[in-house]
Amino acid sequence: SHGKVETDEEFDARWVTYFS
């Protein structure tokens, strides 16, 4: 994502990738 504000989907997708 670009910029400070992200959607919940972007946030979740990033963490899902980290912890998978």
Swiss-Prot record:
Keywords attached to this entry: Heme, Iron, Membrane, Metal-binding, Mitochondrion, Mitochondrion inner membrane
Subcellular location: Mitochondrion inner membrane
Pathway: Energy metabolism; oxidative phosphorylation
Keyword Transport listed: no
A GO CC term assigned to this protein in UniProt: mitochondrial inner membrane
UniProt GO MF annotations: metal ion binding
Subunit structure: Component of the cytochrome c oxidase (complex IV, CIV), a multisubunit enzyme composed of 14 subunits. The complex is composed of a catalytic core of 3 subunits MT-CO1, MT-CO2 and MT-CO3, encoded in the mitochondrial DNA, and 11 supernumerary subunits COX4I, COX5A, COX5B, COX6A, COX6B, COX6C, COX7A, COX7B, COX7C, COX8 and NDUFA4, which are encoded in the nuclear genome.
Function description: Component of the cytochrome c oxidase, the last enzyme in the mitochondrial electron transport chain which drives oxidative phosphorylation. The respiratory chain contains 3 multisubunit complexes succinate dehydrogenase (complex II, CII), ubiquinol-cytochrome c oxidoreductase (cytochrome b-c1 complex, complex III, CIII) and cytochrome c oxidase (complex IV, CIV), that cooperate to transfer electrons derived from NADH and succinate to molecular oxygen, creating an electrochemical gradient over the inner membrane that drives transmembrane transport and the ATP synthase.
Family, similarity comment: Belongs to the cytochrome c oxidase subunit 5A family.
Protein name (Swiss-Prot/TrEMBL): Cytochrome c oxidase subunit 5A-1, mitochondrial
Organism (species): Thunnus obesus (Bigeye tuna)
Taxonomy of the source species: Eukaryota, Metazoa, Chordata, Craniata, Vertebrata
